[in-house]
Amino acid sequence: MSRFDGRPADLISSRRNPLVHQVRALQQPRGRREQGLLLLEGTHLLQECRRLGLPLDRLIATTRWQEQHPTLLGSEPLQPVSPEVLQAMASTDSPDGVISLLPHPAPGLQAPSWPQAKAP
């Protein structure tokens, strides 16, 4: 995670880093409940979060992904990781370079109403 002093976080290159275990736990309902976070994998889901204005807890991304998608970087903490570490965190076979952690909605919150498509 980015440091509070404004300096970027160090690249995580070890699969034994505690963050790897924390993120992998989010693949299970218990981990999501305990940490209060949702795991979103991929650029498309991050784009949707940005489009909807959803607040993110943090981004975890490879250096290459950051270079290719600078406009998707926001004000939330950014944790750079090696491609091997991202692969260890992800549930997909071929992650595209980014994982977003989103605060889990509080119980009882109503989902936003989506516009209904009109029948032809």
Enumerate the predicted regions with their spans:
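RNA substrate-binding interface of SAM-dependent RNA methyltransferases
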Residues: 3-6, 10, 51, 84, ...
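Solvent-exposed alpha-helices and their adjacent loops that cap or buttress functional pockets
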Residues: 30-32, 91-93, 113-116
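Structural motif
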Residues: 36-37, 57-59, 77-79, 96-100, ...
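Glycine-rich nucleotide phosphate-binding loop and flanking beta-alpha elements
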Residues: 46-47, 67, 87, 106-108
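Short, glycine- and charge-enriched coil/turn segments that flank and shape catalytic ligand pockets
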Residues: 53, 64-77, 108-118
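Glycine/small-residue-rich loop that forms an oxyanion/phosphate-binding "nest" at active or ligand-binding sites
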Residues: 69, 73-103
